[in-house]
């Protein structure tokens, strides 16, 4: 891990997408904090410097008074010359009409609208934030951006600072008899394949064991299906990554989640990890063994 701290200060107009932005940075592997008082930033950075957990930080700072701006300006001047710190200010903006529409949709009041008129609060906030916007290295206008598109823009601008992939694939096996995985994006059913359970010498093994893996894969229908499966999955992965999805969960299921699905999930993970960041898990692989031991 680099010794240099990478800090992104996220600010901008209320309703312009700061919540989506900070969630996007979290997906990119940043340590994130929402609504940090500017005066606490130097002390916070001092603590982070002594921590080995993460060298990438993104935090939201809201400017809601003239004193807040003077505070953040003093803090930025203080940290600007630090040799071990690379920091940027990301400013999120949108047109007044779009911000008004968003507030009406959520039925929330603007934090600076003392008389309840949203537009008055927006105009006051824009006046207070103008100097900070002018000194920001990154300005994103979210007027025409959906939350998904904003995530994509942030990923394109900031993911390059991260040496680790921002898109991860989770390949898992499971048993249909125990229920579908709630977090699965893609589910594939291999219950139509010959079942090793009916081979007594294989019954107590799993798809991770060579005899079971070989038995599952030696059948022509297994090879044909796997070829189609890999051919389906590989072309769509760049699309999921392009859309800003941080984790894609691919689940392969058989009856009990011990033999066929485990073998297929293992082979799929082995092939995908040649080009992608892949984690693997086998939810129900040992469930039958645990049930037998309890009985």
Curated annotation (Swiss-Prot):
Keywords: ATP-binding, GTP-binding, Nucleotide-binding
Family matches, as Pfam families: PapZ_C, RapZ-like_N
Residues involved in ATP binding: 12-19
Molecular function via GO: ATP binding; GTP binding
Residues reported to bind GTP: 62-65
NCBIfam families (UniProt xref): PRK05416.1 (NF003828)
Primary role: Displays ATPase and GTPase activities.
Similarity annotation: Belongs to the RapZ-like family.
Protein name: Nucleotide-binding protein SSU05_0620
Origin species: Streptococcus suis (strain 05ZYH33)
């Amino acid at each position: 891990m680099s010794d240099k701290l990478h800090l992104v200060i996220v600010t901008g107009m209320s309703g312009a997408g700061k919540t989506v932005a900070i969630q996007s940075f979290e997906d990119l592997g940043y340590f994130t904090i929402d609504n940090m008082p500017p005066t606490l930033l130097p002390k916070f950075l001092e603590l982070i410097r002594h921590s080995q957990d993460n060298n990438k930080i993104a935090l939201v700072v809201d400017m809601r008074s003239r004193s807040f701006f003077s505070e953040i300006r003093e803090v930025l001047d203080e940290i600007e010359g630090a040799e071990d710190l690379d920091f940027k200010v990301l400013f999120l903006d949108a047109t007044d009409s779009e911000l008004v529409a968003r507030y009406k949709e959520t039925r929330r009041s603007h934090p600076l609208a003392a008389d309840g008129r949203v537009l008055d609060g927006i105009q006051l906030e824009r006046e207070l934030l103008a100097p900070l916007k002018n000194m920001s290295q990154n300005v994103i206008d979210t007027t025409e951006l959906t939350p998904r598109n904003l995530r994509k823009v942030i990923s394109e601008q900031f993911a390059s600072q991260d040496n680790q992939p921002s898109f991860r694939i989770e390949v898992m096996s499971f048993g249909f008899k125990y229920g579908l995985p709630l977090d699965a994006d893609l589910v594939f059913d291999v219950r139509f394949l010959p079942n090793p359970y009916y081979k007594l010498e294989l019954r107590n093994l799993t798809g991770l064991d060579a005899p079971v893996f070989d038995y599952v894969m030696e059948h022509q229908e297994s090879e044909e299906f796997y070829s189609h499966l890999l051919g389906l999955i590989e072309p769509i992965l760049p699309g999921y990554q392009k859309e800003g999805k941080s984790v894609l969960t691919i689940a392969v299921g058989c009856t009990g989640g011990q033999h066929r699905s485990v073998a297929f999930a293992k082979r799929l993970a082995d092939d995908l990890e040649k080009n992608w960041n892949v984690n693997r898990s086998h939810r129900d692989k040992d469930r039958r063994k645990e049930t037998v031991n309890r009985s």
